[in-house]
Swiss-Prot record:
Residues 1-164 form the Thioredoxin domain. GO terms for molecular function: receptor ligand activity. It comes from Mus musculus. The keyword Cytoplasm does not apply. Its main location: other. Residues 188-204 have a biased composition (Basic and acidic residues). It is found in: Cell projection, Cilium, Photoreceptor outer segment. This is Nucleoredoxin-like protein 1. The lineage of its organism: Eukaryota, Metazoa, Chordata, Craniata, Vertebrata. Belongs to the nucleoredoxin family.
Amino acid sequence: MASLFSGRILIRNNSDQDEVETEAELSRRLENRLVLLFFGAGACPQCQAFAPVLKDFFVRLTDEFYVLRAAQLALVYVSQDPTEEQQDLFLRDMPEKWLFLPFHDELRRDLGRQFSVRQLPAVVVLKPGGDVLTSDATEEIQRLGPACFANWQEAAELLDRSFLQPEDLDEPARRSITEPLRRRKYRVDRDVGRERGRNGRDSGDPQGDAGTRAELW
């Protein structure tokens, strides 16, 4: 997976905007993970509507407040913004664990062509080996939420034997005193999600008009 960004710099979306530039560091952050390539733009209303949905999706899978162990998931924002200021503004409220390409890196455009992205927003899901698992998961994320990951993981395991479980790589996660609270909150959130699924989308859904997307090319 790291080979996709070989020789490039990725930047962490934290306050210091730390650069991830060595091959070893890239491998540590991307290898043996499902990687989401999020194509979006701050000036795109559909992207603005979808961003909170994707943020919530990512946080619920990677934040230890919600899960005992972060999912094997990485996200790279591939900006289609016309200016660097718009890119920075769009990323300001997004998770610190997100990665993004420098604004002046032409790979931003090349990746759009490589993965045949025609409209925004778009989320390309890549297997650990770099092959495309889902060409655009935008609607799936909106419809299923974090449950998408289990489906992708199962498909990746069937199609790519290099996808290892976390216990094959790391020491068992230590349990904290907040574990019962996390478990209870997860159960409540899960039950609420199921209830909404039975009753239909509620009027407070943050998706907005994300069903209609902007043409890119």
